[in-house]
Swiss-Prot record:
Side Vacuolar, residues: 159-170, 226-236, 294-313, 459-477, 527-535, 588-606
Name listed for the protein in its UniProt record: Vacuolar calcium ion transporter
Family membership: Belongs to the Ca(2+):cation antiporter (CaCA) (TC 2.A.19) family.
Residue stretches of biased makeup (Low complexity): 18-30
Cytoplasmic side: 1-137, 192-204, 258-272, 335-437, 499-505, 557-566
Regions of compositional bias (Acidic residues) in chain numbering: 423-433
Location of the region described as Disordered in the Swiss-Prot/TrEMBL record: 1-110, 376-434
Purpose: Has a role in promoting intracellular calcium ion sequestration via the exchange of calcium ions for hydrogen ions across the vacuolar membrane.
Effect of a null allele: Increases intracellular free calcium level. Decreases urease activity. Decreases concentration of the polysaccharide glucuronoxylomannan in growth medium. Decreases RNA level of ECA1. Increases RNA level of PMR1 and PMC1. Sensitive to cyclosporine A in combination with; semi-permissive high temperature, or calcium chloride. Resistance to cyclosporine A in combination with cadmium. Normal cell wall integrity. Normal capsule size. Decreases virulence in a mouse intranasal inhalation infection model. Normal virulence in a mouse systemic infection model.
Organism: Cryptococcus neoformans var. grubii serotype A (strain H99 / ATCC 208821 / CBS 10515 / FGSC 9487)
InterPro entries: CaH_exchang, NaCa_Exmemb, NCX_ion-bd_dom_sf
Membrane topology: Multi-pass membrane protein
Amino acid sequence: MSPPRRVSFPPDTLQEDPPLADSPLSSPKLPEYDRQSSSTPIVSSNLPTDTTNSASAGPRRRQQPSRQVTLDASPPSATRRETTESARTQRSRAGSRRTSNSLDPNPGLMRRVTTVLFTPPKKIGKAPTYWGSMKAAITSTWLNVLLVFIPIGWALYLAKHNGGKDSISDTAVFCCTFIAIIPLAGLLGFATEEAALRLGQTLGGLLNATLGNAVELIVAILALIKCELQVVQSSLVGSILSNILLVLGMCFFAGGVRFAEQAIKSTAAQLNASLLLIAVIAVLIPSAFHFSISSSTSNTDASELANGEGADLLSMSHAVSILLLILYLGYLLFQMWTHATYYVDDAVTGSTQYPEAITNVSEKLKFRNFHRRKHDEEESYSTATTVSDAAVPPSARAEGGEVPATHGPGTAAAETGNRVEHEDAEEEEEEETPQMNVVCTIALMVIDTVLVGVTAEFLVDSINGMVESNPSLSAEWVGLILLPIVGNAAEHFTAVSVSVKDKLDLSISVAVGSSIQIALFVIPVIELLAWTIGKPMTLLFDPYESIVLFLSVLIVNQTLADGRSNWMEGMVLMMLYIIIAVSFWYYPGSTTATLLGCQDSSSVTG
């Protein structure tokens, strides 16, 4: 913002020449405050004036005094407000500088999408060496000390199942493998963040959701091969509940502890919530079909179901699974191609910090004196402007001369604005220094995913023995509550860690995106895989699980509707998840998933 000045316009033409009709200075509608009298003090910049005569310039023209238009300076408070708004605008432009070209509709679609997906929000600095990358991974979190439980859990499992040592309890294997997954989840989240530095936020969120659901997919496939259909369905429903209630609730709570309110991109959040609701409704349609036509006495057995309704349920489940996969492809196309700009991260998040509390009398007096000095400053600035106008010599007014501008409050505000612009320019060039190079990041993600999958497999195999040795536990509760917590540990750690860094949109894309991927991708893939290998798995879920899942999705929709979050909303979601866990502890379970038995599905449909 330049210092306040008065601008001199070029002199008028010959008096005999008619003035231009559209000239703002000759317009009769010109406001009176724009027409300056000869007595008005003039402060103007040195504008060049052409006083040379040309042969083609026509008759000689008489020079008239230059017209002067006063550009009054704003008061200090208004100047400071303009400086703050300008700084915010420039900071927003600096944060989205690297992705602004991708929003231009002129480039081709491929170039636009590639730029949005693979262009990091900040400039990436020099990558470290291999040794530096390994050191950064090892020292990334103190939870890595728990990595010692990986060989311990593996040794106990192999000694019990392959060594024939029955003295080793399944509870010990379960506890060791459960603890071992915690640091693996932390390393996976660290590697995912390093990969997200070099990718767009959308692709990073999709990567988080994919790696987080790898455990659920492996567990579901192994349970399906063993024809444990109830475990498959309970683990998948529990994964969705864990993501949208526990993970999302902890993200809101952790971010709300640091920020009073965090802004959410309402368009993307509402779209994801609506898509999740549609996916859950589509998954629950076969269950609604079954309970609508079943008798109220509940005397339907497997033979009757196999003769009529069972074949219809299988065919309906297969058709719904194919349609859900098509919907998932459309979701990827929408998120990563046609409307990728909805998921672009902005530098200005809109989060609200907690106000600084004024706790004692001295601070209150300082606060009051500050406003009093501010008011006196504005009054002194107004008085100084009047005095400076009166101090201009009359000769300068009469001759149309110029008076050099003096420094005052407006000039100081302008210097402050220039200083803010300089700081924003330095912030714009700030680099994001990665802690790992690309090769080590990819290697860590692959190795960590494999370790998580193997450790989770040992964990699942020890559940049955642990349930038998502890009658208070039920296999359904373990599959609905414990397995999803273990399976979602990776994205749980990542989502909570980035929400504290004021990246709540990434947390939502991880939590809600993971649930969408389970509903639209994992469940249909498991259903079609069961169809391929001849297992009679349907989308007929437990009735109580179906009701709880539907109500939970509705609550999450209402939570994301206002586009802002706080710690109280996070606590509500977490408490709801705990209430559901307590209710399922006493739930005896249902046999709807095993009504068709574990016979070949061809005998049911044929």
